C-alpha cells in the first residue's frame, strides 16, 4: 500500500483509493495502525501528522507528503521505493512505453546497434544509474527519479538461447503488462546500495554470500567486502572435457562485445578486491572504445589508464599507441591488467589470420607473465584463443557471452597462479570449453562454508536455501552468527513441504520457529527495508518465492513498535471479512467458538483471544513483516521498548488461546503448514513464559452484585473472577494487586442477558464486560509469579442453581457491583473491598 499525505481533499476520484482523515482523538501510533489496516492500495491521508508518516515508513509502508496535484498524479499511478531518510522517491513506472521507447541505465548499450532490432518506431533512452538522469522530469519538493528500465530484459536476452531480439523484447514487454510488477527485484537495487553503504560505515569486516551479476554495480565501491560465490572454472577442470571443433554460433543480433569486456574487467576487479581489499589502478591494453568505463564511473571513482591506437574516450589517462612487452615496467603495483589486444583481420586470408591470432595470444600471455613476475597486489585478465597451450592449472577460465561464439576465451591469473604448475591443454579441449560453457557470474570466488564467523558481519541474500546446503547447518549458522542479514525461503506451501522447486534447483523451506535466535529480527522484505531507511508502495505477495529476512545484532531489536512491528497485521483479515466471509465478525466469532466460549454477545469488543497472534499465524503468508516471535519474547522478558501509542499487553494465556484457534482454523482449511506453525508458536510461548495453572485452586476472587435479575436458590450468587493456587503467606501480595486494580474493577460495565445450563444440574447466568480487566489482572499476577487462572478458558458466569432449570433470555441488564472479595475455597473470606 502507499500513503499519500495531503493537507486538503481532492475533487478527483481514483480507483482502489480510500480517504483517511487524521483522528485527533488517537495518537500517532494508533492512526498509523488504523491506516496500515485499510484494504485499498492507495490511501489519501488528510490533515496528516508527520510523526504518523514516520511510523509508517519505518514499518516499510511508503508514506509521502504531497503538496501539489502533479505529485499526487505521479505517485498514485505507479509503485515506488521511498528513501525516507534522504527523501528520494524511486519510481517503478513503465508508462514510458507510451513514448515508444525502452530504457537503459547502462551507457554501453547506447553505443550498440540495438535500435536496429527494436519494435518499429521505437527508440532507446539512457536514464543514468537507477534513473538518476530522469530527476529533471519531476519538479517536486522531494527528489524523484524513475528507476524502471529494460536492462533486466536486455541482460536476460544476452544469456538466453534466443536470437531474435525484437520478438524477445516484445514478449517481455507483454509479460510486464500482464503480470504483477516484480517489485522486490526493482527495489532490490536501491536496497542493496543503501544496505551496504550502511553496513560499511558500521562494521569493519563484512562477508557477502552468493552475489549475482545484478549486484556487481553495488560492490564496485566496496573493495573491503569479502565475497563468496560458486567458485571459478579452473584450467585443471578442463580435464573432464572431450575435444571439439570450432562452432561459430551467433548469440546476439546486436553487438554485445562492450558487455563482454565490461563484465570481464569487473571479474578482474572483484578478484583483486577479494585478495587485497583496495581499489587498484586499472590498466587496459587494446582498450578502444570501452564506452562501458562511463558506467563504472557512475558507481565508483576508479582510475583507468589505457593503451590503444584508437580513442578510449572515458579513460583517465589514454596512450594513443601500441603497448609492448618492454612497457610492462611502466605498470605499478596494486593494479589490475586487462589485456584485450587483437589486430583487425582486414583482408587477411584465414590461415594468415589464424597465425597472427596465435602469435598475439602467445604475446598476450607473455605480457601477463612478465606483469605478474614482479611487484605485489596484481591480477591480470588476458585474452586467449583456442590453440595448443600450456597454462597454469589454477588460472581461472572465463567465457562471458559475446556476439558470436568463435575461438576466444579469457584467463584470470594472480601472481601465485602465474608461478603454479602448467598443464598442456589441447586446442580441441579449449574449443569444447568455449562451445559449451558460458560464465554467468562476475563473482567467481570460493563457496561459503556454513560456519559461524566471530568478527564478521555476514550478508547472505537469497543464497543459503538451496538444497545443496545442509539444512541443519543453515539453521545452526543463523542461530549462532552474532551479526548478520540472512534470508531463507519461507515455507508458504499448504502441505508443509520441506523443500520446493525453483527454476532448475530445489530450495529448503523454513518457518520462523525453525530458528532459536536471541536479539534477531525475523521479518519480510518490507520489514527489512524499514530498518534500513526505505519503504515500499507494494507489499510482497505470497508467490511461493518469498523469503524470511533475519537481522542479527541490530540495535533496533528492542524497538518493538518501530521496526518489524504489528502494522498491517489485520489487513488480510479485513480484506476477507469485509468481502468474502459470512459476516465481518467472522474472526471474532471463530476465535471464541474454537475455544469453547459460546457467549458471542459483544464478541467484537470483548474477545477472549489475541487477534494479533491469530492473524499473524493464519495469514502469515500475506504479512510476516510482524516479528511474532520477537514480540512474544520481549513481552515475556519485560524488555519491550514502546515509543508511544495506547498499548495493550496481552496476557500469555490469550496468546495460547490464539494458537488453539489458529490450529482449529488450519484443520478446517487442511493447511498443514499453519497447523505446525501454530503448534510451534504455542510451544515457544510455553518456553519463554513460565505459565502455571491453578487447576487445583485453593483461593478464588468473588464479585457480589447488588442486583441479580433472575431467580436463584444458591445462598450467595456471585461471579468467580478467577481462581488461585497460593500459599497463605502470599495472600498479602494478592491483596496489594487487588487494591491496585480497585478502581478499574468497579468501573467494569458488567451486564447479563440470558441463562443456560453450564452442565447437568449447574444453572448459570452469562456475564459480559469483564474479560479485558480479567486478562489485565492475570498479567499483574503473572508478573508477581502468583498462579492465577486455569488451563481451560475463563468463561465468566454466575451460578444460580445446582439443579436443572429452564433457560431464559432478558434484555441486557447492568449488574452493579456490591463488593469484591478474596476467599479460601471451603474456608473464610480473607479480604473484601467495596467501592
UniProtKB/Swiss-Prot annotation:
Transmembrane segments: none
Subcellular location: Virion
Region (N7-methyltransferase activity): 171-245, 429-555
Protein name per Swiss-Prot or TrEMBL: Protein VP3
InterPro entries: VP3_Rotav
EC number: 3.1.4.-, 2.7.7.50, 2.1.1.56
Keywords from the UniProt entry: GTP-binding, Host-virus interaction, Hydrolase, Inhibition of host innate immune response by virus, Methyltransferase, mRNA capping, mRNA processing, Multifunctional enzyme, Nucleotide-binding, Nucleotidyltransferase, RNA-binding, S-adenosyl-L-methionine, Transferase, Viral immunoevasion, Virion
Organism: Rotavirus A (strain RVA/Cow/United Kingdom/UK/1975/G6P7[5]) (RV-A)
Residue ranges that the Swiss-Prot or TrEMBL entry lists as coiled coil: none
Any GO BP annotation: viral process
Upper classification of the organism: Viruses, Riboviria, Orthornavirae, Duplornaviricota, Resentoviricetes
Residues annotated as the enzyme's active site: 718 (for 2'-5'-phosphodiesterase activity), 720 (for 2'-5'-phosphodiesterase activity), 797 (for 2'-5'-phosphodiesterase activity), 799 (for 2'-5'-phosphodiesterase activity)
Gene Ontology MF terms: GTP binding; hydrolase activity; mRNA 5'-cap (guanine-N7-)-methyltransferase activity; mRNA guanylyltransferase activity; RNA binding
Amino acid at each position: 500500500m502507499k500513503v499519500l499525505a495531503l493537507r486538503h481533499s481532492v475533487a478527483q476520484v481514483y480507483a482502489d483509493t480510500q480517504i483517511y482523515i487524521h483522528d485527533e482523538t488517537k495518537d500517532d501510533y494508533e492512526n498509523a495502525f488504523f491506516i496500515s489496516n485499510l484494504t485499498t492500495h492507495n490511501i489519501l491521508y488528510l490533515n496528516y501528522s508527520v510523526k504518523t508518516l514516520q511510523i509508517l515508513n519505518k514499518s516499510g509502508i511508503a508514506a509521502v507528503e504531497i503538496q501539489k496535484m502533479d505529485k499526487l498524479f505521479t505517485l498514485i499511478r505507479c509503485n515506488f521505493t521511498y528513501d525516507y531518510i534522504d527523501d528520494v522517491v524511486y519510481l517503478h513506472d513503465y508508462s514510458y512505453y507510451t513514448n515508444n521507447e525502452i530504457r537503459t541505465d547502462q551507457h554501453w548499450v547506447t553505443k550498440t546497434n540495438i535500435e536496429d532490432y527494436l519494435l518499429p518506431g521505437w527508440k532507446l533512452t539512457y536514464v543514468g544509474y537507477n534513473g538518476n538522469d530522469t530527476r529533471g522530469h519531476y519538479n517536486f519538493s522531494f527528489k524523484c527519479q524513475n528507476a524502471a528500465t529494460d536492462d533486466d530484459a536486455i541482460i536476460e536476452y544476452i544469456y538466453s538461447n534466443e536470437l531474435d531480439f525484437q520478438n524477445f523484447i516484445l514478449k517481455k514487454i507483454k509479460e510486464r503488462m500482464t503480470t504483477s510488477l516484480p517489485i522486490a527485484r526493482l527495489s532490490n537495487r536501491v536496497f542493496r546500495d543503501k544496505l551496504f553503504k550502511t553496513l560499511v560505515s558500521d562494521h569493519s569486516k563484512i562477508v557477502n554470500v552468493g552475489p549475482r551479476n545484478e549486484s556487481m554495480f553495488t560492490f564496485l565501491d566496496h573493495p573491503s567486502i569479502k565475497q563468496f560465490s560458486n567458485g571459478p572454472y579452473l584450467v585443471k577442470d578442463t580435464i573432464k572435457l572431450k575435444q571439439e571443433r570450432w562452432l561459430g554460433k551467433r548469440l546476439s543480433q546486436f553487438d554485445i562485445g562492450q558487455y563482454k569486456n565490461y563484465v570481464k574487467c569487473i571479474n578482474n576487479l572483484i578478484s583483486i578486491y577479494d585478495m587485497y581489499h583496495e581499489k587498484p589502478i586499472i590498466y587496459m591494453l587494446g582498450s578502444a572504445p570501452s564506452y562501458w568505463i562511463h558506467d563504472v564511473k557512475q558507481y565508483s571513482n576508479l582510475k583507468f589508464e589505457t593503451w590503444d591506437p584508437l580513442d578510449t574516450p572515458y579513460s583517465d589517462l589514454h596512450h594513443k599507441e601500441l603497448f609492448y612487452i618492454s612497457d610492462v615496467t611502466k605498470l605499478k603495483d596494486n593494479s589490475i591488467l586487462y589485456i584485450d589486444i587483437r589486430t583487425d583481420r582486414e583482408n587477411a586470408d584465414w590461415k594468415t589470420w589464424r597465425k597472427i591470432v596465435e602469435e598475439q595470444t602467445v604475446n598476450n600471455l607473455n605480457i601477463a607473465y612478465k606483469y605478474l613476475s614482479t611487484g605485489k597486489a596484481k591480477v591480470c585478465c588476458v585474452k586467449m584463443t583456442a590453440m595448443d597451450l600450456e597454462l597454469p592449472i589454477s588460472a581461472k577460465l572465463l567465457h562471458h557471452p559475446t556476439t558470436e561464439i568463435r575461438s576466444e576465451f579469457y584467463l584470470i591469473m594472480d601472481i601465485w597462479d602465474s608461478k603454479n604448475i602448467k598443464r598442456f591443454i589441447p586446442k580441441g579441449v579449449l574449443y569444447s570449453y568455449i562451445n559449451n560453457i558460458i560464465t554467468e557470474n562476475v563473482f567467481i570466488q570460493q563457496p561459503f562454508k556454513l560456519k559461524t564467523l566471530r568478527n564478521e558481519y555476514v550478508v547472505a541474500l537469497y543464497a543459503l536455501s538451496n538444497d545443496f546446503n545442509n539444512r541443519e547447518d543453515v539453521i545452526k549458522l543463523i542461530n549462532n552468527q552474532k551479526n548478520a542479514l540472512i534470508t531463507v525461503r519461507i515455507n508458504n506451501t499448504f502441505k508443509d513441504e520441506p523443500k520446493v522447486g525453483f527454476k532448475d534447483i530445489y530450495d529448503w523451506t523454513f518457518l520462523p520457529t525453525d530458528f532459536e535466535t536471541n536479539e534477531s529480527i525475523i521479518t519480510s522484505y518490507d520489514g527489512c527495508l524499514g530498518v534500513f531507511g526505505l519503504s515500499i508502495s507494494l507489499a510482497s505477495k505470497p508467490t511461493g518465492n518469498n523469503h524470511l529476512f533475519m537481522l542479527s545484532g541490530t540495535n533496533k531489536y528492542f524497538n518493538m513498535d518501530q521496526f518489524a512491528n504489528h502494522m498491517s497485521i489485520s489487513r488480510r483479515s479485513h480484506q476477507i471479512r469485509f468481502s468474502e466471509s459470512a459476516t465481518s465478525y467472522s474472526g471474532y466469532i471463530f476465535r471464541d467458538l474454537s475455544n469453547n466460549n459460546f457467549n458471542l454477545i459483544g464478541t467484537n469488543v470483548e474477545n477472549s483471544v489475541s487477534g494479533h497472534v491469530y492473524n499473524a499465524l493464519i495469514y502469515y503468508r500475506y504479512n510476516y513483516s510482524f516479528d511474532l516471535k520477537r514480540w512474544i519474547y520481549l513481552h515475556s522478558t519485560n524488555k519491550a521498548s514502546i515509543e508511544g501509542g495506547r498499548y495493550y499487553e496481552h496476557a500469555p494465556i490469550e496468546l495460547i488461546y490464539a494458537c488453539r484457534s489458529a490450529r482449529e482454523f488450519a484443520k478446517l482449511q487442511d493447511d498443514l503448514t499453519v497447523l505446525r506453525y501454530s503448534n510451534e508458536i504455542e510451544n515457544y510461548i510455553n518456553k519463554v513464559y513460565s505459565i502455571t495453572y491453578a487447576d487445583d485452586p485453593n483461593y478464588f476472587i468473588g464479585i457480589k452484585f447488588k442486583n441479580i435479575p433472575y431467580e436463584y436458590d444458591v445462598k450467595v450468587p456471585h461471579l468467580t473472577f478467577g481462581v488461585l493456587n497460593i500459599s497463605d503467606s502470599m495472600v498479602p501480595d494478592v491483596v496489594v494487586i487487588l487494591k491496585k486494580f480497585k478502581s478499574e474493577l468497579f468501573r467494569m460495565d458488567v451486564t447479563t442477558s440470558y441463562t443456560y445450563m453450564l452442565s447437568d444440574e449447574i444453572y448459570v447466568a452469562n456475564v459480559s464486560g469483564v474479560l479485558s480487566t480479567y486478562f489485565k489482572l492475570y498479567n499483574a499476577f503473572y508478573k508477581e509469579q502468583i498462579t492465577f487462572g486455569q488451563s481451560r478458558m475463563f468463561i465468566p458466569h454466575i451460578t444460580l442453581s445446582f439443579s436443572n432449570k429452564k433457560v431464559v433470555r432478558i434484555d441486557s441488564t447492568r449488574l452493579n457491583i456490591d463488593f469484591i472479595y478474596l476467599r479460601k475455597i471451603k474456608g473464610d473470606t480473607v479480604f473484601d473491598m467495596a467501592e
